[in-house]
Amino acid sequence: MPKIHDSSCTSGLTPSQRSHVLAEALPWLLHYRDKIVVVKYGGNAMIDDELKRAFAADMVFLRAVGARPVVVHGGGPQINMMLDKVGLEGEFRGGFRVTSPEVMEYVRMVLFGKVGRELVGLINEHGPYAVGASGEDAGLFTAEKFQPEIEGELVDIGRVGSITDVDPTSLFDLIDAGRIPVVSTIAPDDDGLVYNINADTAAGALAGALDAERLVMLTNVPGLYTDWPNKDSLVSSLTPAELEELLPTLDSGMIPKMTACLDAIHNGVKAAHVIDGRVPHSVLLELMTEGGIGTMISSESYEH
């Protein structure tokens, strides 16, 4: 059965939590040494200045202790602001952004030119560590047009794609050089048309291709709820089989994240985590403490 989370672990970074990080960190520091950790950067952590800096510091910390972090990001709020600024109406169908060729140019500009560059800059305030990349670079991602089924019919939503292939060679080169790749989720198809890729999906696919130790998803909730909005239903850990059983019952916004976690695990990732990006240093609190602060999906007998 899924393990229910102690909600007291979801508060902010208190002095007690800091002391626990110090006391519990050693075995986890050893565990993650030379291991790849893919982190999907999203939610409030992307728009709050304090959280942005805390996240960047977490990535530098992981690198400093010998782990190999890779960041994958989207940029929904920033894209919305840009489209509003230039007078383009943001249209959604079935929860998916309709992405015309004109909108795609702004998506590309915002993801790689704004969101990615900003995070690279924040990380590099600590040293020359981060390098920006996109799915277009060195064949990292190959995509095809994605058409969702809405009310029983396939719908054309423009330049929205799904990943058909991942070639992580260029990222391995960066990782081996001690860099922190920051990946924007845009990708070309075989004909060179560029598509916007769901960042959750891209992070899951990339984690599998990199043979990552962990996949970490930042969200705006403390973790996975089996009965949203019942806060007592927050789950601390569960197996892939348990998650597959729960998947059809979950809130629609959580399904892409959970599907990406399952895909990553099915492709060899040891464990996936869904955490609250509104908590400063949430990545370290999840990975470097015994209890963690979010939800872990793993078929192995890891402590959280």
UniProtKB/Swiss-Prot annotation:
Name of the protein in its database record: Acetylglutamate kinase
Pathway(s) where this gene product acts: Amino-acid biosynthesis; L-arginine biosynthesis; N(2)-acetyl-L-ornithine from L-glutamate: step 2/4
Keywords tagged on the record: Amino-acid biosynthesis, Arginine biosynthesis, ATP-binding, Cytoplasm, Kinase, Nucleotide-binding, Transferase
NCBIfam families with a match to the protein in the record: argB (TIGR00761)
Location in or out of the cell: Cytoplasm
EC id: 2.7.2.8
Residues at the site labelled Transition state stabilizer: 40, 257
Cross-referenced SUPFAM superfamilies: Carbamate kinase-like
Role according to the record: Catalyzes the ATP-dependent phosphorylation of N-acetyl-L-glutamate.
GO molecular function: acetylglutamate kinase activity; ATP binding
Family matches, as PANTHER family: N-ACETYLGLUTAMATE SYNTHASE, N-ACETYLGLUTAMATE SYNTHASE, MITOCHONDRIAL
Family of this protein: Belongs to the acetylglutamate kinase family. ArgB subfamily.
Organism from which the protein derives: Corynebacterium urealyticum (strain ATCC 43042 / DSM 7109)
Keyword Nucleus in record: no
Residue sites binding substrate per the record: 75-76, 97, 196
